């Protein structure tokens, strides 16, 4: 299986595939799902998908959970869809692997 992220070591950034479920009971990352042979990290978000609320909560949640600056996290694809691509800048590959491995069982 392919990874649900693509790390660029020269730029210290990662493209991360997310499958987001808005209107959830809690904000939670839980394992992964495969859609059209592409793996995605599953993310449940409490916010509604209206006027960018869910997208804003995704950035806030990831920044807080992973101890990253909000300015280093950007949704680059899927602004109005539940399948999203996230760009995270200024992240060390070892730290990224530590984060990812904490969700994969």
UniProtKB/Swiss-Prot annotation:
One Gene Ontology CC term in the entry: cytoplasm
Superkingdom of the organism of origin: Bacteria
SUPFAM superfamilies: YggU-like
Family classification: Belongs to the UPF0235 family.
HAMAP family: UPF0235
Protein name: UPF0235 protein A1C_06510
Lineage: Bacteria, Pseudomonadati, Pseudomonadota, Alphaproteobacteria, Rickettsiales
């Amino acid at each position: 299986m392919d990874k649900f992220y693509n790390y660029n070591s020269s730029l210290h950034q990662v493209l991360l595939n997310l499958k987001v479920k808005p209107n959830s009971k809690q904000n939670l990352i839980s394992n992964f799902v495969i859609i059209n042979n592409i793996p995605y990290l599953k993310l449940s978000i409490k916010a509604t998908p209206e006027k960018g609320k869910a997208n804003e909560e995704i950035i806030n949640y990831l920044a807080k959970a992973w101890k990253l600056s909000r300015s280093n996290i950007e949704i680059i694809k899927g602004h109005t869809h539940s399948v999203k691509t996230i760009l995270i800048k200024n992240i060390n590959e070892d730290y990224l692997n530590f984060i990812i491995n904490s969700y994969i069982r």
